[in-house]
Amino acid sequence: MNRTRALVCLFLAVLILAHESEAQCRRLCYRNRCVTYCRGRGKRSVEEPSGGAQVVEKRAVDDADIPSAVEERELDEEESIEFR
């Protein structure tokens, strides 16, 4: 029983690591504000420099809020967002 439990735990750990490695992150910047979206992790960080310091805020976000490739292409055409 302990051997089976250990194998199940190992299998779950591998699945979690595989999911984390598939996270796709994109960094979008507009004026003085940069947003990093990580698709696989479901998190994003918002960076807004104020004065000389940077404030980084992390919060959970739905994958539906992440721009698709088509939306990113439209933003590129408008040239309103700089990709870094």
Swiss-Prot record:
Expressed by the venom gland. The modification Pyrrolidone carboxylic acid is found at Q24. This is Gomesin-like peptide. Disulfide bonds join C25-C38, C29-C34. Its main location: secreted. Antibacterial peptide. Keywords: Amidation, Antibiotic, Antimicrobial, Disulfide bond, Pyrrolidone carboxylic acid, Secreted, Signal. It is found in: Secreted. The modification Arginine amide is found at R41. The keyword Disulfide bond applies. GO terms for biological process: defense response to bacterium. Residues 1-23 form the signal peptide. One of its GO terms (cellular component) is extracellular region.
